[in-house]
Amino acid sequence: MNETLTVIIIIGAFLLAGSIKGIIGLGLPTVSLGLLTATLDLTTAMVLLLIPSFITNIWQATVGGNGKFIIKRIWPFLCLATVTIWLGSTVLTITNPLYLSILLGALLFVYSTLNLLGFRLSISPKHEKWSGPLLGAVNGILTGMTGSFVVPGVMYLQAIGLPRDKLVQAMVMLFSLSTIGLAFALQNNNLLTTELATISAFAVVPSIIGMVVGQKIRKSLSETRFRRIFFVSILVLGAFIIAKSGLAL
């Protein structure tokens, strides 16, 4: 693939991902990771999403006035989801990336299918003490292996019954901490090169432009309908990644 086409793909991926985040408040890491894995490769996609994901999440994580409540309730989950990323990234260095791309596709497929079906787990407060650290650790390992932050982490945050505003802020906290953990893990395994880090920094620009556009579109679009389109698209993207990687084995 020539450099011009690669640049166009990267800009397009982050413009689209930023637009989706502007419309529904979430989705930049998931969309950019899926698109770049489908067109480039998994490791490159994981590195490129780091800075745009962090920059677009950090402000969202600190507003809303619920930070102390959220941290007090889910800090064991957040800690394990962050510190176990290095373990998953170690697997990334010794495993055929095509297998991990298939795993990523499967995670995206499952995540979108469950949301389309309206499936929700329910975890009572008395079970949060053990389920939070357990699912946090699983989420961290899968993040290190695939770059995806959403399964089972987002499902856990939905399952403990957080109100919408607190749920969104908790998810953004998870994504922000996971981005930091992933950056350190990739650097430790010599996968975070200066060249890719520079490109990731430049990718902030189309991400922010996309967010601004998405926020304007949001005013004239049904969020419910868009979410359905979003999850159907992620489902198709996950299936495509599975098929493409499977055929390449």
What are these language model-derived features?
Residues 1-39, 122-171:
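Selected transmembrane alpha-helices and immediately adjacent juxtamembrane segments
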Residues 6-7, 37-54, 98-108, 137-147, ...:
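Structural signature of hydrophobic alpha-helical transmembrane segments
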Residues 12, 16, 51-58, 75, ...:
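Hydrophobic residues within alpha-helical transmembrane segments
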Residues 39-42, 64-70, 158-166, 189-193:
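Juxtamembrane helix-boundary/capping and inter-helix hinge elements in multi-pass membrane proteins
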Residues 45, 87-88, 141-148, 182, ...:
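Hydrophobic alpha-helical transmembrane segments in multi-pass integral membrane proteins
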Residues 48-97, 180-223:
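Selective hydrophobic functional segments
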Residues 57-67, 89, 103-127, 215-216, ...:
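Transmembrane helix exit motif
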Residues 71-72, 94-108, 118-121, 220, ...:
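Loop-to-transmembrane alpha-helix entry segments
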